[in-house]
Design a protein with these regions (language model features):
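Short coil-to-beta strand junction motifs in C2/discoidin
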Residues: 9-14
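Short acidic/polar inter-strand loop motif in beta-rich domains
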Residues: 60-72, 79-81, 92-101
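Beta-strand signatures of extracellular beta-sandwich domains
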Residues: 15-19, 88-90
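Structured interaction patches on ligand/partner-binding surfaces of diverse proteins
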Residues: 95-115
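A short, structured loop/turn motif at beta-sheet edges
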Residues: 20-25, 77-85, 110
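Compositionally biased low-complexity segments at domain edges in trafficked proteins
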Residues: 106, 114-131
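Short amphipathic, basic-aromatic surface patches that mediate peripheral association
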Residues: 1-8
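Exoplasmic/lumenal beta-rich domain surfaces
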Residues: 26, 30-72
């Protein structure tokens, strides 16, 4: 679950990415924001996305407004746990600040059980394992 802070303006675009142990993007897991024309406002992710042939295979959906929450199901291979991988949540709002690491969660058993606080438009992220 992604809980947004209350803020003025358009809905936030949020990207959820798998970051490898070297700190590089490995895979886009989810995109919250429907219009491709705004993807370039998520600058670091957009660089990765254009280098990786531009074809987006992640789940996409609506942007998230201030104070709203969004639920997403993402698949993470258990082999990535406790190996130095992270989940990165990037956020951007039209004509406002871009947050490259609004939330970053280490892929450890302990971290996945805790609430992670955001630094920008995201108030917090809470993950739940689906059996």
């Amino acid at each position: 679950m992604i809980q947004m802070n209350s803020y003025e303006g358009e809905g936030a675009y949020v990207i959820i990415s798998l970051i490898n142990p070297k700190g590089a993007y490995e895979k886009t897991l989810s995109v919250l924001g429907p219009d491709k024309q705004w993807y370039n406002t998520l600058k670091e992710w957009h660089k990765f996305q254009t280098k990786s042939n531009g074809k987006l295979s992640a789940i996409t959906g609506a942007s998230v407004g201030g104070g709203d929450r969004a639920m997403r199901t993402i698949e993470i291979d258990d082999a990535k746990l406790n190996k130095g991988y992270k989940l990165r949540f990037e956020s951007a709002v039209e004509e406002q600040k871009y947050h490259v690491t609004d939330v970053e969660i280490p892929l450890t058993v302990e971290s996945l059980a805790e609430r992670a606080n955001g630094k920008g438009y995201i108030r917090f992220v809470k993950l739940s394992k689906v059996q």
